[in-house]
Swiss-Prot record:
It is found in: Cytoplasm. Keywords: Cytoplasm, Magnesium, Metal-binding, Nucleotidyltransferase, RNA-binding, Transferase. GO terms for cellular component: cytosol. It comes from Francisella tularensis subsp. mediasiatica (strain FSC147). Residues 556-615 form the KH domain. This is Polyribonucleotide nucleotidyltransferase. Its EC number is 2.7.7.8. InterPro entries: ExoRNase_PH_dom1, ExoRNase_PH_dom2, ExoRNase_PH_dom2_sf, KH_dom, KH_dom_type_1, KH_dom_type_1_sf, NA-bd_OB-fold, PNPase. It catalyses: RNA(n+1) + phosphate = RNA(n) + a ribonucleoside 5'-diphosphate.
Length: 693
């Protein structure tokens, strides 16, 4: 067994790449170690293309094993189940980073599995998994020429931090992951605290500068441990077939792409496709027999060339806009009367109905990870039904990876403005229903989430808007597009989503289909996005620019009380009897903590006020010199104990009763008396006198 090893430093941390010791039957197998973190990443490449495959079937699976953190999984089976949302998001991050590095037309299936074997809690293993995926590909024999690496960057007190640990990130205004090759940036994922575009750009360039060390180390490992380059074929469009279709139908295709409406344009294009198929099948074009798939792919290539060349030549985009114009926007709030908050955000042919629901602590999501169980107070879910694009499909299934990814992006974009628990004790769930989609549905979700939460009375710090930027690039010529359509995303070279407030960026997500982009393009895209974002915020602010002061009449009420911690036992009562009685009488939900915090959550204000009043009565402190109406709770030889407030009793001597002209032999338990608190000694004992009738 021959083991090869490479060691390099990243942010003053030693990282070790090793191959030859584990999973040797995989085409590529690398362990990546940093401290006590170890991730095993394997790559398997199919040696032939499956019949009918017309895409690149790359799949990435990031898996966390609970034994890595010395834990046993929860649940009845006590074993790992389906991957968590966080694991799916990391799988997507790796996929998006490495996918652009494969040649166009390479359709062999590749499966990458990254397994966390050991975890120390200091660092997230995601960057190690990304580095390991690139390294395992580099030694697998797959056509992976442009080696990719990735790093995480933080930003604290005006300084960038390379490879920050989890504690660093808690204090950081930025959580940025950048991946790329030696000379190009391929993928960006970030969450930020309303940082200026200049800081975001600086972070991206700072990250890219540090990729070279990792790439060099991977290349050295591949030089000594790589398998021979596999034999493979590249699928190519038949140029003669393409020219024949173009000569006969280009005018019709060109006219179709002047139709602004997506539905009308698609109807026209479908009719042209039908005519193209009939023409090719009924004529002997070049003596060859072509499949429907080959014909439609050639047709699609003509569409792609047309749209791209029009934009690069300065002609109007598909819907008639110039490169910087934003589609018409319509904003409505409070569209659903029975919910706590709602907004309908429409931008061109993309529409999101976003609904906010308020809940109590008990509604918080409990998320299990290698770090333990975390309580999530803010949830955002994104649904993309097939009717949103005029199609039939599966409905009511578990969310797909894309839906999970879009929800996470929208949540990250709005997380920076979401109030902390001390300022706002509600748990919040936001759901985005995409009703129509023609590009930028995730950014419509960002805008709709901001509007919906403000409608629900959630005190977000600032409204947030998002915009998707695109890129068409051919050699040195390029055009950056604001607010891209679905076709521009599909036919273009970049999908760059930017979200933020009027002050700065809260989230970035960039995916590149070409071999990377330059600083100049990034700068232009960020500036164009800033202008577009401010335009969108201006329209949103005309409808609502700050949160409503009160929650909806149909929303639950919540009240937080801070009482003397010693009084918590009085609120709870023996065996919980007191608090159960309050809950039964009022219908409220009551949560207490040893710190003295009491949360009252009720379906309406009446129930809440009743519960609060009952608790206040229990915890109220008796004061000297005050008169109280109490009841006798115990008779003694020398006096009586009178209950004043809650569990607080006072002692009333017979001498005080007789002095007030009342006979002591007539007293009974449960009898009401009006008494004055004479004094309270250091031990908390209360002495009473009877108020004369």
């Amino acid at each position: 067994m021959k083991i090869f090893r490479e060691v390099f430093e990243l942010g003053n941390k030693e990282i070790i790449l090793e191959t030859g010791g584990m999973a040797r039957q995989a085409d590529g197998s690398v362990t990546v170690s940093c401290g006590n973190n170890i991730v095993l990443v394997t790559t398997v490449v199919k040696k032939s293309v499956a019949d009918g495959t017309d895409f690149f079937p790359l799949s990435v699976h990031y898996l966390e094993k609970t034994y890595a953190a010395g834990k046993i999984p929860g649940g009845f089976l006590r074993r790992e189940g389906r991957p968590s949302e966080e694991q799916i998001l990391i799988s997507r991050l790796i996929d998006r980073s490495i996918r652009p590095s494969f040649p166009d037309g390479f359709f062999n299936e590749i499966q990458i599995v990254a397994t966390v074997l050991s975890y120390d809690g200091a660092f997230s293993p995601d960057i190690l998994a990304l580095i390991g995926a690139s390294a395992s590909l580099a030694i697998s024999g797959a056509p992976y020429d442009d080696v990719v690496a990735g790093v995480r960057v933080g930003y604290t007190n005006g300084k960038y931090i390379l490879n920050p640990n989890k504690q660093d990130l808690r204090d950081s205004d930025l959580d940025l992951v950048v991946s790329g090759t030696d000379d190009a940036i391929l993928m960006v994922e970030s969450e930020a605290n309303s940082l200026p575009e200049s800081v975001m750009l600086g972070g991206i360039l700072y990250a890219h500068k540090h990729l070279k060390t990792i790439i060099n180390s991977i290349n050295r490992l591949a030089k000594v441990a790589s398998k021979p380059r596999m034999e493979y074929s590249i699928y190519q469009i038949n140029k003669f077939l393409k020219s024949q279709i173009k000569s006969q139908f280009f005018g019709e295709i060109k006219n179709a792409y002047t139709i602004a409406s997506k539905q009308e344009r698609n109807l026209k294009l479908n009719a042209i496709r039908k005519n193209v198929l009939e023409y090719i099948f009924s004529s002997d074009v070049d003596g060859n027999e072509y499949t429907e798939k080959e014909i439609l792919e050639a047709f699609h290539d003509i569409e792609k060339d047309l749209v791209r060349s029009n934009i690069l030549e300065g002609k109007p985009r598909i819907d008639g806009r110039c490169t910087e114009t934003i589609r018409p926007i319509n904003v409505k709030i409070g569209v659903l009367p029975g919910v706590h908050g709602s907004a309908l955000f429409t931008r061109g042919e993309t529409q999101a109905l976003v609904v906010t629901t308020l809940g109590s602590d008990r509604d918080a999501q409990l998320v299990e990870s290698l770090d333990g169980i975390e309580k999530c107070r803010y949830m955002l879910h994104y649904n993309f039904p097939p009717y949103s694009v005029g199609e039939c499909g599966m409905v009511g299934m578990a969310p797909k990876r894309r839906e999970i990814g879009h929800a996470n992006l929208a949540k990250r974009a709005t997380q920076a403005v979401f109030p902390n628990e001390e300022a706002y004790p509600y748990v919040v769930r936001v759901v985005s229903e995409i009703l129509e989609s023609n590009g930028s549905s995730s950014m419509a979700t960002v805008c709709g989430s901001s509007l919906s939460m403000m409608d629900a009375g959630v005190p977000i710090a600032e409204p947030v808007a998002g915009i998707a930027m695109g890129l068409i690039k051919d050699g040195a010529k390029y055009a950056v597009l604001s607010d891209i359509l679905g076709d521009e995303d599909h036919l273009g070279d970049m999908d760059f989503k930017v979200a933020g407030t009027r002050y700065g960026v809260t989230a970035l997500q960039m995916d590149i289909k070409i071999k990377g982009i330059s600083r100049e393009i990034l700068e232009q895209a960020l500036e164009q996005a800033r202008v577009g974002r401010l335009h969108i915020l201006g329209i949103m602010n005309e409808v609502i620019k700050e949160h409503k002061e009160a929650v909806s009449d149909v929303a639950p009420q919540i009240h937080v009380m801070n009482i003397n911690p010693a009084k918590i036992k009085d609120v709870v009562g023996r065996g919980g009897a007191t608090v159960k009685g309050i809950v039964e009488k009022t219908g409220a939900q009551i949560d207490t903590s040893d710190s003295g915090e009491v949360k009252v959550f009720a379906k309406d204000k009446k129930s809440m006020d009743m519960a609060v009043a009952m608790i206040e009565e229990i915890v109220a402190e008796v004061e000297e010199g005050q008169v109280y109406k109490g009841k006798i709770v115990k008779l003694l030889d020398s006096g009586v104990f009178v209950n004043l407030l809650g569990s607080q009793d006072g002692y009333l001597p017979f001498s005080e009763i007789e002095q007030a002209g009342m006979k002591t032999n007539s007293l009974v338990e449960g009898q009401g008396l009006e008494v004055l608190v004479q004094n309270i000694d250091r031990g908390g004992r209360v002495k009473l006198s009877l108020v004369a009738r």
